Curated annotation (Swiss-Prot):
Gene: rpl4
Family from the record: Belongs to the universal ribosomal protein uL4 family.
Superkingdom of the source species: Archaea
Function summary: One of the primary rRNA binding proteins, this protein initially binds near the 5'-end of the 23S rRNA. It is important during the early stages of 50S assembly. It makes multiple contacts with different domains of the 23S rRNA in the assembled 50S subunit and ribosome. Forms part of the polypeptide exit tunnel.
Keyword Ribonucleoprotein in record: yes
SUBUNIT field: Part of the 50S ribosomal subunit.
Annotated protein name in UniProt: Large ribosomal subunit protein uL4
Length: 249
């Protein structure tokens, strides 16, 4: 299995043999588990005060008075403490001791990563995610791409490769999130576009492009390759990143 290595102007420089990882079996079930396990590590434990709603001297009147046997305040008939009362405790509040992290076996996690890498070369899966691209997959740049320092040069290279339309798609997808997340630092939602994987340092010049993630090959994980648990992200590799992928096989 071979791939064409492109120059920064989009011309074919030469061909490269792809490592065994690109022949990995597609396992969407493992990919989903690996992504959910990663996401669960970012959950923050939270819980209510155990005394919330309990700070009252209310007591039940007992039987024989024709009223419900619930705790009532001393100076009247107002109900307190129970979940159905105003100001009462919560019925089943969140608890800090709840185990939030989802575990996954080490071998399953590694297989999920290999499977997600292979899935990034399936044109049908990539298009199903909504990505826009031209040519065959995988997309590979020569190592000079890692030396680019200006965002304008990155845009020119992506345009020559025929994938900048996908960045524009992500740029136009930004919208205000529905729900309480708007008050919690998550006001906007935006689609993911290109993932740029380099052999050395991450490509800093691509950080401000809409929906683009730039990482070193040793920082790869299932969530980067399958955002939202859906595999087939449009991925651009450098030649040195492809060579280092042999360590994952």
């Amino acid at each position: 299995m071979k791939a064409q290595v492109r120059t920064l102007t989009g011309e074919i420089a030469h061909e490269i043999d792809l490592p065994e990882i690109f022949r990995e079996e597609y396992r969407p079930d493992l990919i989903k588990r690996a992504v959910l396990a990663l996401q669960s590590t970012r959950f923050q434990p939270h819980g209510t005060n155990p005394y919330a709603g309990m700070r009252t001297s209310a007591e039940s009147w007992g039987s024989g008075r024709g009223a419900a046997q619930v705790p009532r305040l001393k100076n009247g008939s107002r109900v307190a403490r129970v979940p159905q009362a105003t100001g009462g405790r919560a019925a089943h509040p969140p608890k800090v001791e709840k185990i939030l992290v989802k575990e996954i076996n080490r071998k399953e996690k590694r297989k999920a990563l290999r499977s997600a890498v292979a899935a990034s070369t399936y044109p049908d899966l990539v298009r199903e995610r909504g990505h826009l691209f031209e040519g065959d997959l995988p997309l590979v740049f020569e190592d000079r791409f890692e030396e680019v320092t200006r965002t304008g040069d990155v845009i020119a290279a992506l345009t020559a490769l025929g994938v900048y339309a996908d960045v524009e798609r992500a740029k136009g997808s930004r919208k205000v999130r529905a729900g309480r997340g708007t008050m919690r630092g998550r006001r906007y939602k935006q689609r993911k576009s290109v993932l740029i994987v380099t052999g050395g340092e991450p490509l800093r010049a691509a950080r401000n492009l809409a929906g683009v993630d730039a990482v070193a090959v040793d920082q790869l994980n299932a969530e980067l390759l399958a955002p939202g648990t859906q595999a087939g992200r449009l991925t651009i590799w450098t030649e040195s990143a492809i060579r280092r992928l042999e360590e994952f096989s």
